[in-house]
Amino acid sequence: KHTKVLIIGSGPAGYTAAVYAARAMLNPILVHGMEPGGQLTTTTDVENYPGFAKVIQGPWLMDQMKDQAKAVGTEMIEDHISSVNFKSKPFEAIGESGKKYTADSIIISTGAQARWLNLESEKKFRGFGVSACATCDGFFFKEKTVAVVGGGNAAVEEAMFLTKFASKVKLIHRRDKLRAEKMLQKKLMDNKKIEIIWDSVVEEIIGDDDPKNVKGLKIKNVKNNKTSDLKIDGLFIAIGHDPATKLFKDQLKMDNEGYLITKPDSTETNVPGIFAAGDVKDKIFRQAVTAAGMGCMAALEAEKYLAG
């Protein structure tokens, strides 16, 4: 299948790119996996997407974006891209289905996944007191006690952000010192609402089934192997994200964490005609609205590129 614009990945970035590309009469094809919509499909309440005064649901918002992209003329294909060749034109992408897609330009919006602890109890309470995004969900924990797992910049920033809402924040770290930058560490130590629990890991999340909510944690001290219970109302996992870029390893420039590198103030990668939008290239903001904005930029830049 040949197209002027091939969009790999859905979510706010992919769908917005599709809307703009379709309205520019570029007849885009968007290839998405089994469960399209990206990370927003795993969150429940969304309160920070512009244009909605009432709380909306993440999956609903993604369905709306998908329907909008379809309505303006995007062709959606369910397939999993397993290999690409960006070294010659037209660009090539091969799906697990065996289908071959060729394109004059490509927008990559494959996103990222939060790293999880991989506990059964974590899966159970994800979206019901367990989250990987303080910016998204901190607001729901006004005057409550929450815990954050991690020891890097992200964990420290999440912990400090959560003190705006929570009455107490416990930062759980498996080592005896943090990896975060010194400046951040100082701010953290100065914050009276934050308590650090060193040398510890979360073994289990404890809570109720009906309605689903988190009540506490079982934590283990890795030095003496003692377990203890901790009463909390919410848990935030901040141990990093993994961008979905393995596919592009020898084709596109990435940073040491695997995020695609784009030119300043642009979504263009080091290969002209290949653009990247959303969490696949953004490790700073990671919001639906910024991803959508980048999707728009990528489509406009692709249009300009195709016009020569």
Task: Spell out what each predicted region is.
Residues 3-72, 156-182, 255:
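Beta1-alpha1 glycine-rich phosphate/pyrophosphate-binding loop at the start
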Residues 4, 27, 129, 144-145:
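Residues that mark the start of a beta-strand
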Residues 11-12, 35, 112-114, 153-154, ...:
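Residue-level detector of alpha-helix initiation sites
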Residues 69-95, 100-103, 164-264, 304-308:
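A Rossmann-like FAD-binding core segment of flavoenzymes
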Residues 76-96, 100-139:
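Glycine/small-residue-rich loop that forms an oxyanion/phosphate-binding "nest" at active or ligand-binding sites
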Residues 118, 123-140, 239-285, 294-297, ...:
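FAD-site-proximal beta/loop scaffold in flavoenzymes
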